[in-house]
Amino acid sequence: MSTLQQSASGKKDGDIRYLTPLNIDTNKTKKYCRFKKSGIKYIDYKDADFLLKFVNEQGKILPRRLTGTSLKYQRKVSVAVKRARHLAFMPYVADLLK
């Protein structure tokens, strides 16, 4: 087979197939809001160790799809993190926070 026929058939060694379906595992466990589970009503901005669970290594607030928090508590977490940053309990940016 010539290289032209191999490229047309798509059976060349080491060839990447772009139209093949990816094996995406959609059976992941559902994430639940830890605040609803524990019954936490108030998120304390002075507890920086607890708030570090909701920021990444650079100090950015993690999105809901990664943390699993509900919309109501995600807003409260973001307000608490912003207050903690303003009062210097947490840094605004960091190279490696954790």
From Swiss-Prot:
Keywords: Ribonucleoprotein, Ribosomal protein, RNA-binding, rRNA-binding. Part of the 30S ribosomal subunit. Forms a tight heterodimer with protein bS6. One of its GO terms (molecular function) is structural constituent of ribosome. PANTHER family: 30S RIBOSOMAL PROTEIN S18 (PTHR13479), SMALL RIBOSOMAL SUBUNIT PROTEIN BS18M (PTHR13479:SF40). It comes from Flavobacterium psychrophilum (strain ATCC 49511 / DSM 21280 / CIP 103535 / JIP02/86). Belongs to the bacterial ribosomal protein bS18 family. InterPro entries: Ribosomal_bS18, Ribosomal_bS18_sf. Binds as a heterodimer with protein bS6 to the central domain of the 16S rRNA, where it helps stabilize the platform of the 30S subunit. NCBIfam families: S18. GO terms for biological process: translation. One of its GO terms (cellular component) is cytosolic small ribosomal subunit. This is Small ribosomal subunit protein bS18.
